[in-house]
């Protein structure tokens, strides 16, 4: 089971939108500090947490786009995410890395004596690229253009089917606080 190893950041809800708090708890120093990307001197409580964040920092959240006309630049519609906070599955569960588990759970519920895991993807059955892509779906940074939701990714899928290559960006203007960990 995945747990917070480095830091823990909280959020708050305002209607159907969530916002990141500017302080985080850092386990290495056993203390609170400024959350990544926030100013240490100017408090900001307006950093919107959208589906992209939940796709790697939770197991699931139901969401939809609400396109509403309004007073916007060039009269364009504004797409606003509507998150269902009651559907949020906190933490990273088994299915995020091993795929859908309903058949696995049903089989082992009916056969409690069976000790061999079945009806679920074991990492050793994936080739090297599939294993790398499975981790990279969340640990390769946020500099690529997403084609489809990370929630749809299943073991054995190719990362190239989820993201387009990144355009060269000015790293000082669009800093990725995730550090491209992969």
Predicted feature locations:
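A cross-kingdom signal targeting lumenal/periplasmic-facing segments of multi-pass membrane
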Residues: 1-40, 48, 55
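Primarily the internal scaffold of c-type cytochrome electron-transfer domains
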Residues: 1-3, 9-14, 35-37, 62-182
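C-terminal substrate/ligand-recognition segments
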Residues: 48-50, 54-64
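Short, flexible loop/turn elements at secondary-structure junctions
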Residues: 25-27, 57, 98, 139
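Membrane-entry segments of alpha-helical transmembrane domains in multi-pass membrane proteins
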Residues: 39-49, 87-90
């Amino acid at each position: 089971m995945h747990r917070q190893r480095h830091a823990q950041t909280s959020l708050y809800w305002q209607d159907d939108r969530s916002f990141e708090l500017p302080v985080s708890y850092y386990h290495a120093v056993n203390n609170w500090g400024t959350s990544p990307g926030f100013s240490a001197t100017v408090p900001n409580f307006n950093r919107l947490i959208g589906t992209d964040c939940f796709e790697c920092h939770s197991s699931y959240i139901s969401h939809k786009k609400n396109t509403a006309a309004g007073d916007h630049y060039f009269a364009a519609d504004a797409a606003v995410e509507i998150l269902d906070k009651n559907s949020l599955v906190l933490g990273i569960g088994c299915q995020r890395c091993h795929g859908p588990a309903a058949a696995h759970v049903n089989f082992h519920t009916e056969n409690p004596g069976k000790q061999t895991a079945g009806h679920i993807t074991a990492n050793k059955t994936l080739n090297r690229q599939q294993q790398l892509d499975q981790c990279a779906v969340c640990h390769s940074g946020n500099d690529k253009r997403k084609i489809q939701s990370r929630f749809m990714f299943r073991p054995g899928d190719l990362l190239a089917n989820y993201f387009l290559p990144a355009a060269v960006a000015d790293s000082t203007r669009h800093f990725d606080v995730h550090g491209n960990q992969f």
